[in-house]
Amino acid sequence: MLNSLDLEGRPQDTRVVVAMSGGVDSSATAALLKSQGYDVVGITLQLYDHGAATHRKGACCAGQDIHDARAVAERIGIPHYVLDYESRFRESVIDSFADSYALGETPVPCIECNRSVKFRDLLATARELGASALATGHYVSSRRLDDGSRALICAADRDRDQSYFLFATTREQLDFLRFPLGDMTKPQTRELARQFGLSVADKHDSQDICFVPTGRYTDVVERLKPNAMEPGEIVDLNGHVLGSHPGIVHFTVGQRRGLGIASRAPLYVLRLDAAHRRVVVGPREALRMERIVLRDVNWIGDGAIDQAVGDGLELFVRVRSTRAPQPAWLRAVGGGYEVELVAGEEGVSPGQACVFYDAADGQARVLGGGFIKSAAPRWSADGVRDDAASPALAAMRG
């Protein structure tokens, strides 16, 4: 007989570690599992030097959060531990964040944190404590498959769905993870927290990168990668110099405001050339990308990825966490993987994730994804389709 977490045994005989960030979501998760009779242990990771972020409204993982998590644990009567992971977090997340920006990318540190810290080290700690599962407050679900493994499923509340940030979860990790809030909305979670008498029921949602206390990511990059602040040229698609800039770290793909150059027509950042310290700008139509080259691909669909992809796999992808899944094709090309966006997408930025889904709506299954290495436009600068860079995609288009 399986319990409500799809685990063998009675709840009272099942230990579950809850990753408690100090926010309402993870707090409600811990309280809910405790009320269902599980043997709950709360763990909070101290990830960075809190400093100026300690009491800033909307910050995540700040010093106040540790206090809040401890207070919730005391309220619901569970043991609570704080683990110092500052060194690991700095090496795995903060340093790579700065490196990525210095390369002209737009990183997603939450994905790296989940992959390199929370779902690796914290999961290992949960096992050492004799837990049968690690539960989090993410808005995402998992479903038990016929073979006993688990599939990652989008949250019922699509406005809160966090599946984009969890695509790098491995199959082994997914089998051990549980997401009790996957079928709930945020208002329902807050109401649940009120029913349990939790002090964080009305706490502000985290909105910022937790280790950027001022809200200015450039401060972090400047401190760790000062070369990213070196000035350079702003050029058009033909290489004509239009102006200068104080450092590529100040720009992102798709940006229009703050370019500091005069033009009769609106110009947008199309590409960041870190090697030459150049910001390439052009018209909005040049932002539309059709082909994406991926790196660090993770597959959590059925079977092996090569068998699933074959000569081409039709699926849906998200290239930003705030965008809806769009139809695409996934293909194996030259020892790696490429995605063709059927309708194209604007503002596809290297460093972001391209996440695979089996459907565009409803509680779709996450099939995996990869990080965007590069993207090619629907049209080249001279108005010709850019098929030459990918023979496989050119053949598919006919």
UniProtKB/Swiss-Prot annotation:
Catalytic activity: S-sulfanyl-L-cysteinyl-[protein] + uridine(34) in tRNA + AH2 + ATP = 2-thiouridine(34) in tRNA + L-cysteinyl-[protein] + A + AMP + diphosphate + H(+)
Site (Interaction with tRNA): 138, 352
InterPro entries given in the database record: MnmA-like (IPR004506), MnmA-like_C (IPR046885), MnmA-like_central (IPR046884), MnmA-like_central_sf (IPR023382), Rossmann-like_a/b/a_fold (IPR014729)
Subcellular location(s) per record: Cytoplasm
SUPFAM superfamilies per UniProt: Adenine nucleotide alpha hydrolases-like
A single Gene Ontology CC term: cytoplasm
Cystine bridges: 113-210
Catalytic residues (positions): 113 (nucleophile), 210 (cysteine persulfide intermediate)
GO BP term, pick one: tRNA wobble position uridine thiolation
Listed GO MF terms: ATP binding; tRNA binding; tRNA-uridine 2-sulfurtransferase activity
Pfam families: tRNA_Me_trans (PF03054), tRNA_Me_trans_C (PF20258), tRNA_Me_trans_M (PF20259)
Keyword RNA-binding: yes
Region (Interaction with tRNA), start-end ranges: 160-162
Gene3D superfamilies the record matches: Adenine nucleotide alpha hydrolases-like domains (2.30.30.280), HUPs (3.40.50.620), Translation factors (2.40.30.10)
Segment forming the signal sequence: none
Keyword Transferase belongs to the record: yes
Binding site for ATP: 19-26, 45, 137
Keywords for the protein's UniProt record, in alphabetical order: ATP-binding, Cytoplasm, Disulfide bond, Nucleotide-binding, RNA-binding, Transferase, tRNA processing, tRNA-binding
Record-listed E.C. numbers: 2.8.1.13
Record function comment: Catalyzes the 2-thiolation of uridine at the wobble position (U34) of tRNA, leading to the formation of s(2)U34.
Family to which the UniProt record says this protein belongs: Belongs to the MnmA/TRMU family.
Protein name: tRNA-specific 2-thiouridylase MnmA
Species per Swiss-Prot/TrEMBL record: Rhodopseudomonas palustris (strain BisB5)
Gene that specifies this protein: mnmA
